[in-house]
């Protein structure tokens, strides 16, 4: 009599006991269990975007294709990296690394994200910059109990420098409100070293001259909000 066996549908390994199969965890089974994880989903969408942009279509690609792809680990590593650094506008970041022909194994490099972010904050819509900055300061307010509009005015100076250097607070906000101007005037040498590359006054003053209506709108919104 042939003993009954239980086969893993992912790796096809056979077991004598169903209970052993139940606790078995092969690489493919693990990947399917991780499918709903945010970082894995970002990896999947990046994988699909890569095929769409480089080969014209990804319509027939499924999660099963992704999970069995030799590039699975690299894309998931990137997805988890985006979650870890709270990357700004992940879809745009993905498009950018593909258009720039960045090697997949370089997508998680800090220098690559910084290069993207420098370009992105210069080109993004004012409304996106305002929304992100206001949302960031509201979360700060929830943590500290201070009014959101006082982040640049009374927030920890190093925390403010970090927020600017990571794109949470855009130069649109820093240059166009009273508290931002005050912060710039009072920065110490270390903070200036961190912040200056991200606010590039020459570039932004030219941008404000080119888009006076946007600047006026930004100033008015921030003034009304008490910034």
Residue ranges and their predicted role:
Residues 1-44:
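C-terminal recognition-helix end and immediately following basic linker
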Residues 5, 9, 46, 112-115, ...:
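Intrinsically disordered, low-complexity N-terminal regions enriched in serine/proline/glycine
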Residues 33-77:
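Charged, amphipathic alpha-helical linkers/stalks
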Residues 63-227:
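Intrinsically disordered, low-complexity regulatory/activation regions of eukaryotic proteins
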């Amino acid at each position: 009599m042939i003993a009954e066996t239980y086969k893993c549908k992912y790796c096809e390994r056979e077991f004598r006991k169903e209970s052993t199969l139940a606790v078995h965890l092969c690489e493919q089974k693990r990947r399917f269990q991780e499918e709903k994880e945010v970082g894995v989903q970002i990896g999947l969408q990046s994988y699909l975007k890569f095929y769409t942009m480089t080969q014209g279509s990804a319509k027939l690609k499924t999660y099963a294709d992704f999970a069995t792809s030799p590039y699975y680990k690299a894309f998931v590593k990137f997805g988890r990296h985006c979650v870890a650094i709270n990357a700004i506008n992940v879809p745009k970041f993905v498009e950018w690394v593909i258009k720039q022909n960045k090697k997949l194994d370089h997508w998680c490099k800090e220098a690559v994200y910084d290069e993207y972010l420098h370009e992105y904050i210069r080109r993004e819509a004012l409304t996106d910059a305002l929304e992100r900055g206001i949302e960031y300061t509201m979360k700060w307010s929830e943590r500290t109990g201070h009014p959101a509009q006082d982040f640049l005015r009374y927030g920890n100076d190093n925390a403010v420098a970090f927020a600017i250097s990571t794109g949470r607070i855009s130069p649109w906000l820093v240059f166009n409100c009273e508290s931002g101007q005050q912060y710039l005037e009072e920065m110490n040498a270390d903070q200036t070293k961190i912040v200056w590359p991200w606010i590039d006054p020459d570039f932004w003053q030219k941008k404000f001259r080119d888009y006076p209506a946007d600047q006026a709108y930004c100033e008015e919104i921030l003034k009304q909000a008490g910034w």
